[in-house]
Design a protein with these regions (language model features):
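A domain-level signal for the structural core that forms small-molecule/cofactor-binding pockets
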Residues: 2-124
């Protein structure tokens, strides 16, 4: 049930963004075995001039926020972070050193799923 929001510098062609979406999806399925039908990913593009890394304005970087149901192990989360970071580097060429992944765990009572019900009500 992972929901990913990616902050990506503007300027990448649509084909690269599609490749990134596919790569991120594979990263999620490969690392935490989430069912494909439960994965949601959106790209939010940010002008490079609106970013700063280590005091340097305009340094390309990627921030990925992952919202998911609590319960994954520390190792699964580490694998997810590694897979997502590699997917960014492989798909759009932004260094793994300039990618950050933030994981937010939600209890099953605090996350809505298909049908407008909580994950708990859906049987998760």
């Amino acid at each position: 049930m992972p929901i990913l929001s990616i902050k990506l510098p503007t300027g990448h062609p649509e084909e690269k963004k599609r490749t990134l979406l596919d790569g991120l999806t594979r990263a999620v399925t490969d690392s935490i075995a989430a069912p494909l039908k439960t994965i949601r990913i959106t790209i939010d593009e940010v002008p490079v001039a609106n970013t700063i890394v280590a005091g340097e304005i305009g340094q390309p970087n990627v921030i990925i926020t992952v919202a998911m149901i609590a319960g994954r192990s520390e190792q699964q989360k580490a694998d997810l972070i590694a897979h997502l970071s590699r997917a960014v580097q492989d798909c759009v060429g932004i260094s793994i050193d300039h990618t950050r992944v933030l994981i937010q765990d939600y209890p099953i009572t605090d996350l809505g799923v298909a049908g407008g019900i909580t994950a708990k009500a859906s049987g998760r």
